[in-house]
Amino acid sequence: MAKRVFFSFHYQDVIDFRVNVVRNHWVTKLNQSAAGVFDASLWEDAKKTSDIALKRLINGGLNNTSVTCVLIGSQTFNRRWVRYEIMKSIEKGNKIIGIHINAFKDKYGNIKSKGPNPFDYLGYQYSSDGKQLHLYEWTGGKWEEYKDLAPYRVNQIAPESLRGKFYSLSSVYRVYDWVADDGYNKFSSWVN
């Protein structure tokens, strides 16, 4: 069954057409359902919008989605709003995956080396009572509390074994390579 997927990406990768390869791979299949995806992402370039308006735009884009797919290019890890989309997806309870997209040619025929994994730069920690989740980001050579989304109460108290421990998102969420892992044929299984 097809999932409503929110794609998170750096806008430069749209300009280079790498994002479009993944988001539009369904057009050569029978339909979006056969590809396993209904795209619920934001196409707008909202660079001139306030922080509050951008958060509202992202939050609205995440509504009615069950999966967040982070398309990893060269600078994705460093983008403030990609980080927000990931952290908000955790709060929402979406399944989260990453996909490296630098292994196929851009519109100029160039291939790039893999970009840094954004999940290496984000993390979380359950409170000692297991009732709250605190979010962190790697910045300035150290882990700091994430400022764009406050700690929040979790729906279900965390098991004692998870309380008070820090987890990098890369230890929790899977990352694939669109080319090496055959994303064209396997994407629907990744999001299910």
Swiss-Prot record:
EC number from the UniProt entry: 3.2.2.-
GO biological process: defense response to virus
Activity modulation: Activated upon phage infection.
UniProt note: phenotype after gene disruption: When this gene is missing the Thoeris system does not confer phage resistance in B.subtilis.
InterPro entries referenced in this protein's UniProt entry, alphabetically: ThsB__TIR-like_domain (IPR015032), ThsB_TIR-like_sf (IPR036490)
Domain of life according to the entry: Bacteria
Family as reported in the entry's similarity comment: Belongs to the Thoeris B TIR-like family.
Entry text on domains: Has an N-terminal TIR domain and an C-terminal antiparallel beta-sheet.
Protein name stated in the entry: Putative cyclic ADP-D-ribose synthase ThsB1
